[in-house]
A protein has these predicted regions:
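Surface-exposed charge patches
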Residues: 21, 68-69, 94
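Structural recognition of the beta-strand scaffold that forms the well-ordered cores
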Residues: 7, 47-51, 76-80, 105, ...
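Alpha-helical scaffolding within the catalytic cores
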Residues: 34-39, 60-66, 121-126
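Surface-exposed patches in mature extracellular/periplasmic domains of secreted proteins
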Residues: 29-37, 79-82, 101-109
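Short, well-ordered loop/turn elements at secondary-structure boundaries
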Residues: 45, 72-73, 131-133
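Short alpha-beta junction capping motif
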Residues: 48-89
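Aromatic-Pro/Gly-enriched surface loop or interdomain linker
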Residues: 1-48, 52-55, 144-146, 152-170
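An acidic, glycine-rich "communication" segment
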Residues: 16-17, 84-163, 167
Length: 170
């Protein structure tokens, strides 16, 4: 399995490459990350899209509409290291008004926990949006999924589990 993942915003490419290597080693999934700037941003090339930091606040109406189409057609949006519940809620309502945000625990999000990690002990703060009971938006607050130094690589396990579950159709 080989897919490209878009990194948009202030994403750490070195840590993204660690995530790629982690997935390849643990799941035999080969992923390539691609950084793209706003000038030539095209969401339709990517099944998985990372928006890092507050980059979601900088998206144009056109980008939001394209992102909406991609998510409704099955893409996965990961919002990494967002800061404000208020601005994220406004963005999610604009992006997917007909689908409510949820605050499920990580164990609920990852019913198929490939790495058998007890995420409840780690206390990630997240929001999600589901379409037909499939995770389509996952947002991590005040932490970066790419920071493998935190939590003894549990951030990598979290990201790997989300991507793995998405790729196998869960």
């Amino acid at each position: 399995q080989s897919d490209k993942i878009l990194l948009y915003g202030n994403c750490n490419i070195d840590e993204a490459n660690k995530l790629s290597e982690y997935l390849k080693t643990t799941s035999n999934i080969d992923l390539a990350f691609e950084i793209n700037d706003e000038a030539n941003l095209l969401f339709s090339k990517y099944p998985i899209i990372f928006l890092c930091g507050n980059s979601y606040l900088k998206l144009s109406e056109t980008h939001i509409q394209e992102l909406n189409r991609m998510i409704l057609n099955g893409s996965l949006l990961l919002i990494d290291n967002y800061k404000s519940d208020y601005t994220l809620s406004i963005f999610l309502k604009k992006l997917l008004a007909e689908y409510p945000e949820r605050n499920n625990s990580i164990s609920e999000v990852l019913k198929n926990n490939h790495y058998k990690v007890n995420f409840e002990q780690i206390q990630f703060k997240t929001k999600q949006v589901y379409i037909s009971e499939k995770l389509r938006v996952f947002a991590l607050k005040n932490e970066s999924i790419f920071d493998s130094e935190l939590n003894d690589d549990n951030n990598l396990r979290l990201a790997s589990s989300i991507i793995f579950n998405y790729l196998i159709g869960n």
